[in-house]
Amino acid sequence: MLITISPAKTLDYTSPLATTRYTQPELLDYSSQLISVCKKLTPAHIASLMSISDKLADLNAGRFSEWHPDFTPENARQALLAFKGDVYTGLAAESFSEDDFDFAQQHLRMLSGLYGVLRPLDLMQPYRLEMGTKLENKAGKDLYSFWGDTITEKLNQALHAQGDDVLINLASDEYFKAVKPKNLNARLIKPVFLDEKNGKFKVISFYAKKARGLMSRFIIQNRLTQPEQLKAFNLEGYAFEAADSSANELVFKRHEQ
């Protein structure tokens, strides 16, 4: 099984590292092309394009100008340990063993607006470039046109390397839109996490993001290789709901506490 997750806007480049091992991202030539476009943007343009504050725009203009493709542990950090959003709170990779990192490196992929596809130990310099950003480039008007089939091909290579044909989609819609399911050599399975609020079950973004991380951790730490095994997921009060699930959509519900 291959798992896809989204990146995070919040980054951590200071806390202690859970592993010193690292790999290099495989699509840096593409990243360099995007950086050359981004380096031409003024902070004001960045603020408008990304709908962020002037302070954040200045920070990211600086990141773009300082970015260069010679990645070392001194100027970059392993992607799985650099991202720090809700998904990564659930994943809690800072407590992974070396064996956990080995399994994750083979079975987990992070989709990224700048890096395309990242493996957990791939070094990453700090950036902000969400997949939905309407950044004009030589391929078209946005990042979906820029990445084209590249991300899908990379996922196919990872599936082929492990001799498998199941992809567990734990990424957001914004990011998974960069994948072309018709060209993917895999059966797609999407876990959905519903929380009860006022007697009704619905997707609550904050909880759902954390649950995607928890599910990723559950797969990695239990070395799961079959979709059927996902139904045993029971972390933090979630339970599989067979009646609401289908072959390609696994629904997990959590009752109000």
Swiss-Prot record:
InterPro entries: YaaA (IPR005583). GO terms for cellular component: cytosol. It comes from the Bacteria. One of its GO terms (biological process) is response to hydroperoxide. It holds the Pfam family H2O2_YaaD. NCBIfam families: PRK02101.1-1, PRK02101.1-3. Belongs to the UPF0246 family. PANTHER family: PEROXIDE STRESS RESISTANCE PROTEIN YAAA (PTHR30283:SF4), PEROXIDE STRESS RESPONSE PROTEIN YAAA (PTHR30283). This is UPF0246 protein ECA3888. It comes from Pectobacterium atrosepticum (strain SCRI 1043 / ATCC BAA-672) (Erwinia carotovora subsp. atroseptica).
